[in-house]
Amino acid sequence: MVTFSSGKAVTFKDVLSNLHILDYDYYFNVVDGLLAENATQPLLLLDEILRKGFDGQNFIVGLSEHLRNLLVSQDSRTVQLMEVPDSIRKKYAEQAQACSPSLLLSWLNISNQCDINYKASRNQRLTVELALMKMANVNAVFKSNGKGEANATAEPAGLKKKLNP
């Protein structure tokens, strides 16, 4: 890393840039947008990430890992399963309080399907964008279906009924 630092102090941002790694903050901001049931913020963040040269599949894999860490951080007995610094662990604990386990499982299911289908897709960007839009709307679908909250499936029966009368 010293070679790339131009003689100045090496910062966390420099390391991320040189190693081409996405910062945790991107994923925290994506989840904030999803919690607000707003697809715009996650889509704009995805665009920014793609413009920086990151691969869409790397983004979705990172988002899946972030969602998994949120789920794991909801139980004090499983927090040790996260391999992150203590400062980041605290941020996970804070964000996890705003997410139900069923919502996180629904999002994980959607992101996992996106990851599986990514390579076969002819429009990979759309595949990731569609996953983000589904995640942003999963709670709204369940609320309109009268269930109140998302369960662990990505495509609820109510949605299928609306699409196939």
Q: Residues of each region from the PLM?
A:
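Long, low-complexity intrinsically disordered regions
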Residues: A157-P165
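Extended, largely alpha-helical regulatory/partner-binding modules appended to the mid-to-C-terminal parts
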Residues: M1-G158
